[in-house]
């Protein structure tokens, strides 16, 4: 199996291109069948928002819905709203909406807790299934998102397993009979590189390992087919491409073949088969309901539902294959355009493309690295209203400028204007100003 992305290589050779113009971008917007979906969001007029891979944009429906929950359902309905406003069913009802975006079936997903907490639960479950197998290795990528590695380190230490970190190029050779669980993030947060979930899952199963997939940069961004890929466990984020708001509840999925074996390490009362019987001993709820732990955050779930509905609105544009098929077509066109414009207009500025050109290996973001000034360049862009973000490099890769492309609210003219600002920041040396080189607490 080939690695999911090519090694970092300097781009923007001095070649002759058929230049793309602003008029071309405006023509693409005029032809875009999804352009009306932008009207679902509140976006400041002076902002070009390319950071939906960190925090999605606020849906217009969210403030009114949250106010309704606070003033009516809580303020007037009070505790009755657990029944009359269907609060009790929210984790499963929202889970069914997520299922439509990740290739899962109704009743297989719940929205609850954070990504980190849900990862703890599903990885614990996978390790419990393998506890008598003699397998002691958990495999993950060295470049995985740190919280995943921290959770895995903690669980491996507690459960007597060993975490082994690899490079993507080592798959599938590293999948030996010592491996209990393969834990991967579907789309890499630093590079935008996307794994072939179906092929890797098949290789893991052939080696006797279970798979845990993190969909934080996939759900709402790219088509995901959990059941078709025969994956074992998955978790994902609610506040990125799903537009659920800061700190929105995450989600968890388990393949139905494991549902009866899932061992809940956080056996709170909300995951009990009959929580309002108040019995002294835990009896897990059937199926995915046992993923729940404590009383659910109703106001946050209401905000998440508004975000989910913005994504599901794209189903109308591809009724056969669903929302993600429609969004994926535009996402690839946006990222292709961004790469092309940067190649045309930023040659000689020291940028390197680290996101795969191959559509089959690319998420919904474009990442560029630079030996000097990546953080300051991002800050200078933000000061101009072009919001992307920065991620620190390592011994194998310089610092990174990340740009997320959410087709629900980004247009082709937005891409043109963003690159125009990037050109100006680079050519004028604006990024060298002192205020852009002072690190903020959140980068």
Give the role of each language-model region.
Residues 5:
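Arg/Lys-rich, positively charged N-terminal/basic patches that mediate binding to nucleic acids
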Residues 8-9:
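Cysteine-centered motifs
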Residues 12-443:
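Pyridoxal 5′-phosphate
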